[in-house]
């Protein structure tokens, strides 16, 4: 059984600069992007997520980007090595802090990636 994709909500475009934590660095010590491009048909939910209680709360994420396999285009292969990659949405730059991969039930086929950004 394939899970449905919320086509009506996937209307956003983000610009992603993938960096690998073990990638080469330029002469100024900055990580060189391994892949860069625009990803269309994503679901973007920009709302601040907190962790903690009362006055001891910290910001965990400023937004959530969901890229669906077979619908979002192009969809790069992402791994935990890509944490810290840069993402641009509506002219603002964000850093990927969490990356989750979800597979179709009963298979190992990719359903979507969820990126939490700050």
Swiss-Prot record:
Q: Which InterPro entries match?
A: Minor_capsid_put (IPR019612)
Q: Which family does it belong to?
A: Belongs to the Lactobacillus delbrueckii bacteriophages ORF5 protein family.
Q: What is this protein called?
A: Uncharacterized protein ORF5
Provenance organism? Lactococcus phage LL-H (Lactococcus delbrueckii bacteriophage LL-H)
């Amino acid at each position: 059984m394939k899970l449905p994709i919320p086509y009506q909500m996937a209307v956003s475009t983000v610009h992603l600069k993938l960096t690998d934590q073990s990638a080469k660095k330029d002469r100024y010590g900055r990580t060189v992007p391994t892949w860069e491009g625009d990803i269309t048909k994503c679901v973007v939910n920009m709302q601040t997520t907190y962790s903690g209680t009362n006055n001891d709360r910290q910001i965990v994420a400023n937004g959530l980007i969901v890229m669906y396999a077979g619908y979002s285009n192009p969809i790069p292969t992402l791994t935990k090595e890509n944490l810290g990659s840069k993402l641009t949405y509506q002219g603002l730059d964000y850093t990927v802090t969490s990356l989750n991969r979800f597979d179709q039930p009963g298979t190992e086929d990719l359903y979507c990636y969820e990126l939490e950004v700050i």
